[in-house]
Each structure stands twice: as structure tokens, then as C-alpha cells.
Amino acid sequence: MRHIISAPPHVDVSATVAELAKAQGLSVQSDPSRKICEAYGYQTIYEMPLELQKRARRQLIETHIEALQQRDQVVCDHSVFTWLADWMRWLWSETPAEEWEAVLDLSRPAIPLYGTIHHIADGKLAAYDGYRWLDRRNGVQIERLLRHLYTDFGCNERVVFSHT
């Protein structure tokens, strides 16, 4: 069974991930965002020039789907929903409708691979790691977008809502 964590970036999901992994004997798939940014020579995705940022975001989605296809007993500390919500929050005005539809189409294969989606709305503030945007107000906006994405992708019945 695949367990997917979907949470705003300011929320520390590590305890939930560890509990799920231990209780169900699952391996942990960590968010590849930092590695992908560093591979392009950047600390965060937000520093990248626009087109490179879009390419990196697509690469995150592709990498995530490939990892899911290789492992079925896993808990992921990330989801396509979080990346899509972040894209909507920060790049909406720079993404034409046709391009956004292509991004959604790229993301769609992840959804049937998801088992339980653990939506963590709020909780303990994540420690600064030099990568994530930890502003709570931004997190509230991302969290609202996550809920819309579950509906758009037709997977509300697999979402479990909780707090850390």
C-alpha cells in the first residue's frame, strides 16, 4: 500500500511519516525537490529562472511517478498535489491555460498509484532547512488549493484529513 503525505510546506510531517513507516513496515520515499534544485545549481526552486523552474517542477512530477511505479510498499513525504498547489500559488500568472492542462495531464498518472492520501492541514512548524517556504499564511493558501486539487483529480474518497 502506498501512503502519500499531502501538506503545506510549513508543516513538519516527519512524525506522521515515521509512524506510518513503522506501523506498516513501509519504506520512506523522500521529497526529491532539494536534490533536483541542487542538480541545477540552485538552493531552491524559487531562485530559478522561470523556464528552468517550470522544467524542474515537471521533472519532480516525472521523478515521483517513476518512483511510485517501482515501489508499492512506501510512504511518500510529498505528493503531486503539493507541487501543483505551489505552482498555482507562485506561477499562475506565468502559466497559460494550455500549459497548465499539460502539467495536469503529466500529473494524472500519479493519482491511481496513490493509496491513502494523508492531508495534514496544520501542525508543528517544520524546521528551517534552507529550501522550503515556511510562511504560515502561504501555507494556508497552499492548503486550500490542495483541497481543490483532490476534487479536480476525483480522489476525495482516499483523502484522510488530520493534523500533526
Spell out what each predicted region is.
Residues 6-8, 76-78, 120, 162-163:
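Short His-Asn-centered micro-motif
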